[in-house]
Swiss-Prot record:
Protein task: Cooperates with the reticulon proteins and tubule-shaping DP1 family proteins to generate and maintain the structure of the tubular endoplasmic reticulum network. Has GTPase activity, which is required for its function in ER organization.
Protein name (Swiss-Prot/TrEMBL): Protein sey1
All copies of domain GB1/RHD3-type G, residue ranges: 53-288
Taxonomic source organism: Neurospora crassa (strain ATCC 24698 / 74-OR23-1A / CBS 708.71 / DSM 1257 / FGSC 987)
The family this protein is said to belong to: Belongs to the TRAFAC class dynamin-like GTPase superfamily. GB1/RHD3 GTPase family. RHD3 subfamily.
Length: 862
């Protein structure tokens, strides 16, 4: 039968099937050599006790050797412990064996029975070391200690195992009195065998109680417990069984009745000294349980036995704490496996995105993290809360710290990514909304756009942060991160507002430049309006369009800048810009407007431009009379006088244009007053792109006079020289035109003409037709000469004659091509080899009446 039990050396490294076979009838917990079986936990798992938690009970049986302890357990619990052969009187149970109750129908669940090696055996003789150690082990682990004695041994010291019970009492004082907060009680269940019935069970009970009380009073007790009673630490129960051999049927019946008592019960408060049973309902009271979870029983028992074997003082609370530490660590590692499976992929995904430089916002991270944490903590609580409360609380806190540190790092990185993504999305949303507003016509409220997008972005981040919140966990309150995010959005909003105001300033500056380009260009174009038709006299004061040009330029400039300031201020209000920001923007606008005006003026007075305007001004005065009619120069005209007056008048513009002066003050405009003082809100970045202005910026070193000087002295002199050369050319051209109209014919030619042509002259005068024809020709020639049409008429006549010749050539070519004889005589090629000649029309002739050259090339004249 022992072959069906797992001994200490069996089961290591065996398969589950072999373990099931080895554990069929139980396991040897301690062998005769005092070695502990580390396979106990496998046995508990195989019998499904390990998963029972606290729902199990442990019973140990004591008694003298060969008194039928194993037989009693086999009948009572259905176990199959080895029993002594009736033909041999030798030891059968060696060490401590354990088996699970097989008769579970009427008993409590998961009853574990330990069969302890009998005492007073001849095999060990005087060696009582194992006897004491096994008693200490059983008392430290068991709820109920069954003492198996025969009726005739009641009243005896050795026979009734009183020496063993004394050891039990001493061990109890050693173990449980150290832990005064938890006075663990034990039940001594006396099973009196071979009870004949002559002596009532109550009398036997009284005898045993008296003996036990006497033993209790004889043992030494700690200070303060000298007067303690045995009933303060032990409960007693009694049962009697008839003789197994002589009364087998009754023995079986009483054993079954005895088995019904191994259920949960409670204390009978109304019991008296004559009762043979002090417990009601069953022998398993809650205070008997050692409060060691079933899955930790093997480790706990091993620690207990190691302490016992090494003869160290056994401290059960310490052992329970050590067990709790071991099991809590083990459970923590187990529950973290599932936690790792859920969180590790997210950590890796986040790490990869961070390495790539694009932190990712993980979807459903809060839900996944909260569920993984809750599951991990709940599983730990379910399995570990059954152990020592102090250790459990500490280990749970350690587990929560460990998983919370991982979640915290993951969540913070997640919020950092959400933070960056939110800022980017906010900036892009504002930019897109501004672009949409500009495309819609430019009417958009920047402040409303920023506030709307900010509220939307904050709500998204808030939801993301709230999704990471774990109830009851302080660190998961990400309100500080929310406040930091809100603060950064405010900073981004301020930056975007500043950028938008900068863009607004750029748009206004462009508008100012555009308006200045038109207005200033118009004023400078008026410099050419010096002709008489405009009311400008040839002498005296300069026309109004010339002498007050700078007043009109400054007036137009002030008007444009004022309108620009109004536009800027109105738009800046829609940005909710502060007064300082508005003042800085206006200050920058005025400075840049003056620079734009100065650049436009410099463009107008560039050498090529100003020289052209001076020429136009001069030609208007020289080529046109007082009424604005073009002059036709004749030799009798005072060309020199007109030229001198027009030249001097135009040269008077050079000093006028060389300096920006107002006629009202005869001084430059007050740029210091125009620009204004530097506002308090100006930052260094606001001045980086500003051009220094002389007379305004003290550090520039230029004076207001230098700032308003348009043409330097060398430039003026060069301009005067170049203008005079140009004016001289115009004068020479006019003079040549006047002289070129006089034909130099010798006077004698007229006398010769009169003598030689007198007959013809008289004939014409006498012939009315010729006379009228002469009058018509003479009149037409005079009119054509007066209107300067002789040239065009001669050109038209030349073109007509040339066209006639071209048409004649074309007709001749057609004749030759169509006449076989002519073509043969001239050796012309066949007709199909000739190029097709296009017809002649007016649009194919040039100004001389000749055919224009085409891409096909001109035909050779015939």
């Amino acid at each position: 039968m022992n072959g069906h039990f797992a001994a200490v050396d069996n089961g290591n490294g065996s398969s589950p099937d072999s373990n099931a076979h080895s554990f069929e009838h139980g396991i040897q917990v301690i062998n005769e050599d005092k070695q502990y079986n580390t396979n106990l936990n496998e046995y508990l798992n195989e019998t499904h006790v390990a998963e029972a938690g606290f729902n199990y009970h442990l019973i140990s049986v004591f008694g003298s050797q060969s008194t039928g302890k194993s037989t009693l357990l086999n009948h009572l619990f259905g176990t199959q412990f080895s029993v002594m052969s009736e033909r041999e009187r030798r030891q059968t149970t060696k060490g401590i064996w354990m088996s699970k109750n097989k008769n579970e129908g009427k008993m409590a669940d998961n009853i574990l029975v330990m069969d302890v090696e009998g005492t007073d055996g001849r095999e060990r003789g005087e060696d009582q070391d194992f006897e004491r150690k096994s008693a200490l082990f059983a008392l430290a682990t068991s709820e109920v200690l069954i003492v198996n004695i025969w009726e005739h041994q009641v009243g005896l010291y050795q026979g009734a195992n009183m020496g063993l019970l004394k050891t039990v009492f001493e061990v109890n004082m050693q173990l449980f009195l150290k832990d005064k907060q938890n006075q663990t009680r034990s039940l001594l269940f006396f099973v009196i065998r071979d009870h004949i019935g002559v002596t009532p069970l109550a009398n036997l009970r009284n005898t045993l109680i008296q003996d036990l009380t006497h033993i209790w009073s004889s043992i030494s007790k700690p200070a303060g417990l000298e007067n303690s009673k045995i009933e303060d630490y032990f409960d007693f129960a009694f049962a009697a069984l008839p003789h197994k051999i002589l009364q087998p049927d009754k023995f079986i019946s009483e054993v079954q009745n005895l088995g019904s008592r191994f259920i949960a019960g409670h204390r009978n408060k109304d019991s008296d000294a004559t009762d043979d049973q002090e417990l009601t309902g069953g022998v398993f009271l809650p205070e008997y349980h050692r409060r060691i979870p079933a899955d930790g029983l093997s480790i706990y028992a091993e620690g207990i036995w190691d302490q016992i074997v090494s003869n160290k003082d056994l401290d059960l609370p310490t052992q329970q704490e050590l067990l709790a530490q071991f099991r809590c660590d083990e459970i923590a590692r187990e529950v973290q496996i599932a936690f790792d499976a859920a969180i590790a992929p997210l950590e890796e995904q986040q790490a990869e995105s961070t390495r790539a430089g694009k932190p990712a916002v993980l979807p459903n991270l809060g839900q996944i993290g909260a569920e993984a944490r809750e599951k991990c903590v709940k599983n730990f609580e379910t399995q570990a809360s059954r152990y020592h409360k102090g250790v459990y609380t500490t280990k749970r806190a350690e587990l929560e710290d460990k998983i919370d540190n991982r979640l915290k790092a993951l969540y913070q990185a997640h919020l950092t990514a959400a933070h960056k993504a939110g800022v980017t999305a906010f900036s892009e949303a504002v930019a897109n909304a501004v672009k949409a507003g500009q495309k819609a016509g430019g009417a958009y409220e920047f402040a409303e756009i920023v506030e709307k997008q900010k509220t939307k972005t904050l709500e998204i981040f808030k939801k993301e942060a709230q999704s990471l919140a774990i109830p009851g966990v302080a660190w998961s309150n990400f309100k500080p991160q929310y406040l930091i995010f809100e603060k950064e959005l405010d900073e981004v909003s301020a930056r975007l507002r500043k950028e938008e105001m900068r863009r607004l300033a750029i748009r206004v500056e462009r508008w100012v430049k555009s308006r200045l380009g038109d207005a200033i260009g118009l004023e400078f174009n008026k410099l050419g309006s010096g002709r008489g038709g405009s009311g400008a006299p040839e002498s005296g004061e300069k026309p109004a369009t010339e002498k007050d040009i700078w007043d009109r330029v400054w007036k137009a400039f002030i008007s444009i800048v004022g309108e620009a300031e109004s536009r800027f201020t109105d738009r800046a209000k829609s940005f909710e810009a502060s007064d300082d920001e508005v003042q800085v923007g206006l200050w920058r606008l005025r400075r840049k407007s003056w620079v734009a005006l100065r650049e436009k003026i410099e463009e107008e007075v560039m050498e090529s431009n100003i020289l052209m305007k001076l020429r136009e001004n001069f030609e208007d005065k020289f080529r046109y009379d007082e009424d604005g009619v073009p002059r036709i120069w004749r030799p009798s005209d005072d060309i020199e006088g007109i030229y001198t007056r027009a030249r001097e008048s135009t040269l008077g513009l050079v000093p006028l244009l060389s300096r920006f002066r107002l006629t009202s003050t005869s001084a430059p405009p007050d740029l210091i007053e125009f620009v204004g003082p530097q506002p308090h809100g100006v930052e260094p970045g606001d001045e980086e792109d500003l051009t220094p202005i002389g007379g305004v910026d003290e550090d520039e070193g230029k004076s207001l006079e230098e700032e308003t000087t348009i043409l330097s002295e060398p430039k003026k002199q060069d301009l005067v020289v170049r203008f005079k050369k140009m004016a001289d050319g115009v004068y020479v051209e006019a003079k040549r035109s006047a002289i070129g109209g006089i034909t130099q014919v010798p006077l004698y030619f007229y006398a010769v003409l009169l003598v030689l042509g007198w007959n013809e002259f008289v004939m014409v005068l006498r012939n009315p037709i010729l006379f009228l024809l002469l009058l018509l020709i003479s009149g037409g020639t005079y009119v054509a000469y007066s209107l300067n049409l002789l040239g065009p008429m001669m050109q038209m006549a030349n073109a007509a004659s040339t066209q006639g010749m071209e048409i004649g050539k074309a007709k001749l070519r057609d004749f030759l091509e169509n006449h076989e004889g002519a073509r043969g005589a001239l050796g012309m090629p066949p007709k199909n080899a000739q190029r097709v000649e296009s017809g002649i029309s007016m649009d194919t002739l040039d100004s001389n009446g000749k055919r224009k050259e085409t891409g096909l090339g001109a035909e050779d004249d015939i």
